[in-house]
Every structure is written in C-alpha cells, then in structure tokens.
Amino acid sequence: KEDFSDADGLRAAELEGEFAELDGWEAEPEAAVLLQGLNIPEDLHHLQMKELNAGQKIKVLLAQALFGKPDVLLLDEPTNGLDIQSIAWLEEFLINFENTVIVVSHDRYFLNKVCTHMADLDFGKIQLFAGNYDFWLESSQLAQKLQSQQNAKKEDQIKELQEFIARFSANASKSKQATSRKKTLEKITLDDIKPSSRRYPFVGFKPEREIGNDLLQVDNLSVTIEGKKILDNISFTLNKDDKVAFLANDDITTTTLFKVLMGEITPDSGTVRWGVTTSQTYLPKDPSAEFDNDLTIVDWLRQYASKEEDDNTFLRSFLGRMLFSGDEVLKKVNVLSGGEKVRCMLSKNMLSKANVLVLDDPTNHLDLESITALNDGLIAFSGSILFASHDHQFIQTIANRIIMVSDNGVVDRADTTYDEFLENKDVQQRVAALYA
C-alpha cells in the first residue's frame, strides 16, 4: 500500500497492542524452550515436520499442546515416545504449570510426581481422590477392605439373630425378644461390593536351566543404518545375575542394539558372543510382524508349545491367566490390539523357559494392571534380563545395572539402582559427554 494513513497507523498500533497482550513477542523464545526441553536440538527448529523422524514429530506435537499457557491441558499418554530426559523435563514443566492438567498415563512414577488428584473410573462411574497414584491405590484398597470387614461383621450379626429367632420364636417367654430381633434383622443391609473390573494377568518366567559363568560379551560393536551411525565402539560384558536397563536418547539406538544381539541385524563391525548355557527369548518393540497371519490366538501360541504343552486344555488355561478367556482364544491374531499382542508375546516368552529375557520397551501398550503384573514377574525372575524402558518405576525396581548407549560409546554402571544412576553427578557428566 503506497500511502500509510493515520487510520492505518491507529489500526497497526491496536494490532501491536493485541499482539503484546497475547505475549506474541515471547512466542518464538517460548517455542524454542519447549522444543529444547523435549530434546529437539536448535538446528532442527526450522525444519518442516516431514523432515523429522517419528519420535521427533511426537515431541513437536506435545510442545504444540504445551505452547501458549493454555487454561486446561488434556494429555493422553504424554510420555509415550519420549526419552528419559524429556520425561523428566515434562514432569517438572507440569509440576510448575499454574493451570489445570488432565492426564491419562500408565507411568506410575509420572502419576506420583505430577498429579495432585486421581480420578478412578470403574464400572462406568468416576470417583475423585485427593493425592497421587500411590495414595489412591492404598486408599481405594483400604476402603474396599473396610467395606468387606463391615459386611463380615453384619453377616455374623445376621447369623446370630437368625439362630436366636429360629430357636425362641415359639417360646412364649422369649417371643418378645424374638420379635425385637426380627425387626433388627430387617434393618440390616449388606453393602453391594462389586469386584473391580480391573484384571491382573499372571506373569511368571521359569527358566529351564541356570546360566553358567558367561552371559554375554560384546566387543567394539558398530552399526550404520541408511548412512547414519547408530552404534559405535560399543563394548560390555554381562554377568549371570545382571538385570540390565539399556538407556539411550532415542529408541532406535536400543532397538538396533537388541536386534543385533538377537541376530536380526548384522553389525558393520564387532562381535556378539552369548554364553553356551544361555537361551534367549525376545520381545521386540514392535511385534506386529509376529501376527501377520490369520491364526487364532490359541493356534498361534501352539507354535511355541512343547509336545507336553500342545494340549487345548493347557493352552486355554495358560491364555486364561493372560486374560484371554473363553472364546477370546479363538480371535484372529491379525485383529488384536497393541496390548493384546504384547500379552500374547509375553505368553510366548514364558513358554520358552529361557534363562535370558530380552525385552524392548515391554510396557508399551500395556495397562497399569498388566504393567504391575509384569513388573512383579520380572522382579521374581531368577535369570538375567536385558531391557529398555521409559518407565521410571519399572527400571528402578528391576534393574541392578544401567548401561547408557550412544553412537559414541557407553556409560556402564553395575550394582546400582536407576535413582542412584541419575543422582550420581560424575555419571551424569559422563552421560552428557556422550552427546556433546
């Protein structure tokens, strides 16, 4: 426009004022802070979405939801697809967020750290509890226990009254007392206690043999995928009692490592040597290829059963413990949900009787009840475990060794918990140096 009139100037001033009220001048710096907090480096900030990988796209979409200080944040599984550092940053962001957050999550540590209230949805009804996840769990279980105890006392009282009435109702001297007790009996009502709709599968791994002295030796492992170095100079030795959590800044690193260990990817260089007494069973991060057929669940599992186990009664019973009951075992595996596929894979893993479990993000797609059951099963497992996870509590309660993996080597800490690993300043400096 050639001439900028006084009216144009006034309108421009109004728009600038509105822009300032919306914190427009802070928009770009705020976006940068959010992206960097979610581990999107600055050199990627001006790329188009189509140029990012799947994990980076998820982070950008999450940053988009967090942007602009909304009145209400609705977050559905926000930790899915995030690395450990991004989850820790998100926890602090939400703790300090001044407005309302409504979140669905299966990460117990995340719920404990972030939430001030829990909304319990069961039997189509919702009940609000003040407190975090652990407080809700204890409170709800205590409430049900007290209700059951009260019902038991009422049942004893009912039995006692019924016995008195039956004994003395025909006795003239006791008839008034019997009538009084009848009235008391009529007033007693038992609480209707419905069992929770939540169901816990049974997860238990029993190795067929013990591991000898040698578990796994990895020397100078390097892997390149599509021209990008994923692993470089990776070396470590695992011992028979190790339950190892493998961490990385992105999932492709740990997934690639596990695929190499299981012989699915040939490394550019380096060697992998399993101990002669070891037997491995593997749960991949994406098990979809295992279900690319039209077998029923029971026939799919039959492929992995021994001769003694190849029996419909046994297989149906086994699947029943994994929450596939009745005719559900006749469902085709190619239509299963993500959680159902993981439960099938865990069934296969259990039938293998292997003494080494290799689990790539095993809590992915599982509900809280299944995560809890798996968590307990792995704690009780007498063999060795190599696993990757983003679930803080899962790692903390299972792992006795932490290995951080990158395209620049590893940081390896034995005889440690996850919390100790995170709190050790020297270790965290070494981790930072991996990605410098």
Give residue spans per PLM region.
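Generic structural signal for secondary-structure transition and capping sites
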Residues: 99, 163, 170, 190-193, ...
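ABC ATPase nucleotide-binding domains
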Residues: 147-161, 165-167, 174-183, 199, ...
